[in-house]
Amino acid sequence: MEVILLERIAKLGQMGETVKVRDGFARNYLLPLGKALRANAANKARFESERATLEARNLERKSEAQQVADKLDGKSFIIVRSAGETGQLYGSVAARDIVDVLAAEGFNINRNQVNLNQPIKAIGVHKVTLHLHAEVDVAVEVNVARSAEEAERQAKGESLTSAEAIYGVDEDALKPEDFFNPEAEFAGEEE
């Protein structure tokens, strides 16, 4: 099916382009969300008459998204979760958790704008990309920790999942002799 794009869509085209897409993609996504029109003579004429309005609206949305991106750029957000001593979370941090933290800070971001390929399942500082507009992306840091104190330590660059952090032992200084005695007699069954 051929459609006329009403806004820029990643990996598909710019506003005003006529592109050929699969019928299901057009019927289930592009047309219901108002991102495209069927490419027929009447809709082409309608698009050309409304083109200036659509471009102005798109420019306004882009400038609003850019203002939010400027406020978010370089910010770090702390999420406190319970985790095991190795740093594995009991559960995970998903896009909705990040949206909740951003909302608490006064940013109105939708869950589908958070670009998180898979949930965060370990403590640490993670980079998360927010897709605010078709042409505006911003990266923020999400600091997942067991407590606010640990979040501060992680922000300074300290690792909380190393053997030193967990057991108070420098893992580079460990030798095999620390764990077993090489001169010990074999206590198992002999052949």
UniProtKB/Swiss-Prot annotation:
Keywords, A to Z, come to:
Ribonucleoprotein, Ribosomal protein, RNA-binding, rRNA-binding
Q: Is Ribonucleoprotein included in the keywords of this UniProt record?
A: yes
Q: Name one GO molecular function term.
A: structural constituent of ribosome
Please name the InterPro entries in this protein's record.
Ribosomal_bL9, Ribosomal_bL9/RNase_H1_N, Ribosomal_bL9_bac/chp, Ribosomal_bL9_C, Ribosomal_bL9_C_sf, Ribosomal_bL9_N, Ribosomal_bL9_N_sf
Give Gene Ontology CC terms.
ribonucleoprotein complex; ribosome
GO BP term, example: translation
Q: Which PANTHER family match?
A: 50S RIBOSOMAL PROTEIN L9
Its biological function?
Answer: Binds to the 23S rRNA.
Assigned protein family: Belongs to the bacterial ribosomal protein bL9 family.
In its UniProt entry, what is this protein called? Large ribosomal subunit protein bL9
Recorded source organism is Sinorhizobium fredii (strain NBRC 101917 / NGR234)
